[in-house]
Each structure stands twice: as C-alpha cells, then as structure tokens.
Amino acid sequence: MAAATLLRATPLFSGLGAGPAPLLQGLLRPLKAQALPVLCRGLAVEAKKTYVRDKPHVNVGTIGHVDHGKTTLTAAITKILAEGGGAKFKKYEEIDNAPEERARGITINAAHVEYSTAARHYAHTDCPGHADYVKNMITGTAPLDGCILVVAANDGPMPQTREHLLLARQIGVEHVVVYVNKADAVQDSEMVELVELEIRELLTEFGYKGEETPIIVGSALCALEQRDPELGLKSVQKLLDAVDTYIPVPTRDLEKPFLLPVESVYSIPGRGTVVTGTLERGILKKGDECEFLGHSKNIRTVVTGIEMFHKSLDRAEAGDNLGALVRGLKREDLRRGLVMAKPGSIQPHQKVEAQVYILTKEEGGRHKPFVSHFMPVMFSLTWDMACRIILPPGKELAMPGEDLKLTLILRQPMILEKGQRFTLRDGNRTIGTGLVTDTPAMTEEDKNIKWS
C-alpha cells in the first residue's frame, strides 16, 4: 500500500514541479459581460498599475459546505486588510457576481480576489460549496498552495465538507487551516469544542495532521459588520496569521518551458482575446510565442499582454493567476481545457500507462470492482475526456482499494506527460487517482476501439 499512499499524498504535478494543477473542468455558464472575473476585468482597459513582486506569492482558497460562510469570510478578509492598504474591499455581492449566484445565494463558479498581508501577496479563490458544482470547486482548488476550510459552528462538518477535503487531498493540496464560522450563532461553548474535535478527526481521516492544524473560531459576519471584535476582527486577524505561518511558500519551477492550462476565455472589446489560468511552470513574458494544444487544436500566436488583478506584468512566473492577451485570435478559436505552452515543448497523447489507486467505498469511491474497457472520465489540468481502461494481462477485475498499473486510452489526444497526475470519475463519484508513467504510441487495435 506504500504506492497507494504515495498516489494519495504526492503533489499533483510532482513531475512538472509547479505544484498542483487544475483537474476537473467546470460546468461553465454562458459568459456575460458583467460576469467577467475579478482577475481579468482590468484587461478591458489599459492597465495603469504595474504588479510589483516584492513579497512571496501564494495561492489560497476557501472550501467547505454550501452556506457555511466561505464568501462572507472572503469579503471580511478584504475589508479588514483594506483598512491597512493590503486589499481592495470586495463586497459579498462583488464576489458572487453572477446573477444566478446572487439569486440562489450560493457560489457557482470559483471567484478570484487578491490581498496582501505584511508577509505575503495572496491570490484567493472562493470555491463553490453546493454539491452540483463540485467540479467547478475543484477547478478552483487545484492551483492552490493551501486551503481555508470553513465549517459552521452550528452545523459542524457536512457532506460537502468531506467531499471538498477528499478532492483537495487527492489533487495535492497539503496544507489546510480551519475557520469555525458562525460562532455568534452558538451559545454553548461545549458544542464548539465538539465541532473542533470532529474537524480534527476528519482531517486525520483524510491524511492531514489533524492535531497540528490551526483552528480559529469566529464569525465572518461579525467581522464584516464590525461588531463583537473578539469573534469578528480578531478572529480574522488570527486566521491570516495562521495562513501566513502554517501554509508554506511553495518552490516554483521557473526553469522549464512555460505551461498554462486554460481556465477561461474572454473577448475584451477593443483589446482582443484573453485566456486566464494559473501558470503551472516556467516564466511567461510579453512578446513570447506560444501554441494552444488539445481538443484537436494546434494554434500558434504571440502573447501581447499579461495582467494579474488589474496590474500589468512584463513577465509572469509559475504560480501566478493571470490573464494573457493573445494576438489575432477570436474567442471561438479557443476553449477551456486547452494548454498554452512554449512551441514544441509539449504534445498531446491519446494513450498512457499509469499507476492508479482505486478508491474504496469509504473514501468515496465505487462499491464494486470494474473490468477491462470500463469507461470513466479522466480529469487533468483543466480538461476532461472519456477514456477506456485496459487492465494488465491476466487481471480480470480492478478492486476498490487496489493500487495497480493500467493502460488508459482517451477518446481524443490531450496534454499528458510523464509525472502528470489525473483523477478518474464515474458520474458524480471520484473513483481513482493516478500518475502517468509512460506515453506509448497507439496500436492499430487501439485505434479500432469502439466509443459508442
């Protein structure tokens, strides 16, 4: 089981060096002008500010069950830091900025904001908690260096709390800080202590250091409304201190050619087409040639501008959450799931060999084994693609809890390379997590596989 433990605990892109990479493609709503993310709205006009890299950059995000207060906490953080010039205050309504999100009172797609503490610069992703949008949440958590798990004191851990922790663990998010929210709604201190105990047990169950994990009790709403400083302001300050100290600054791979999995594509009037995402590795400079690969596309162009949170950059580094303006392309030419890379540095593959851990029922996986030619969906980077699983010769069944070498054949060639991690899902269930070990050529037999 040592290999199984490795697959469950190793950072997602150990072979690529840039830390976790986006895994599960979201169910994108039709894009509207008012729904442009905070990240790239500034590209609609010439940026007036230049991003100054004077502090370590870290990607964090809020995860947790629906309506436990993730977006309220995100807004409270920006409000408190804005008073010292470390952020621009973002109201709840600005973070949940799509009409259907405001109408339902839940976050559907991950939203990005930025802020700075005395020690660090943060890109913060507010991840959706509703069960229907778990795939969107994972697109948000995948580039994260650490998470803030939000749990309501009056509810305790709930179904999406478990699922978010499981998925975050599978994709290599190794450091979690906990904020027990809505403490103002609970009169009994023993109930809060029980919730904390339950959270520590849950963290330990999913492979985190439950006894060492910082847990801060407070109320994001009190902080936002500037009342009860002990539960409000001071709790958020304690949380930020814990994030600064407990979540380490990751080592970025700046030596390899740049690789940007495309998260979203936007058409900016008067400027052109912008792709957004988190730079997985390397350095991207204004004026660099690039190519878009995947989904049967191979398009070459030039990066004419780079911005991060309304500020222009001459160069972006691995870990930066950015928008890149590209020359001569229309929005319909590009799509989520493509990869923007240095020309010639990477190529799509349709067949891979991989070491795969099959999740048990207790881990949220399948109840039953599967056979050769079983067809789940593979998620890696920002793409997902149907694939056929071929079991090793002499192996008739793949059992939950097994760690084994499999061959996977994709419906279309996608960006895959040695060391790349992926997740397998069947319906709304994560059934396995794997690591690519080789990318062999397709045989004639492989090419004749039926997909209907």
Curated annotation (Swiss-Prot):
It catalyses: GTP + H2O = GDP + phosphate + H(+). Its main location: mitochondrion. Residues 1-43 form a transit peptide. Residues 105-109 are annotated as: G2. It is found in: Mitochondrion. GTP binds at D67, G69, K70, T71, T72, N181, D184, S219, A220, L221. The modification Phosphoserine is found at S312. GTP hydrolase that promotes the GTP-dependent binding of aminoacyl-tRNA to the A-site of ribosomes during protein biosynthesis. Also plays a role in the regulation of autophagy and innate immunity. Recruits ATG5-ATG12 and NLRX1 at mitochondria and serves as a checkpoint of the RIGI-MAVS pathway. In turn, inhibits RLR-mediated type I interferon while promoting autophagy. NCBIfam families: EF-Tu, PRK00049.1, PRK12735.1, PRK12736.1. This is Elongation factor Tu, mitochondrial. The lineage of its organism: Eukaryota, Metazoa, Chordata, Craniata, Vertebrata. The gene is TUFM.
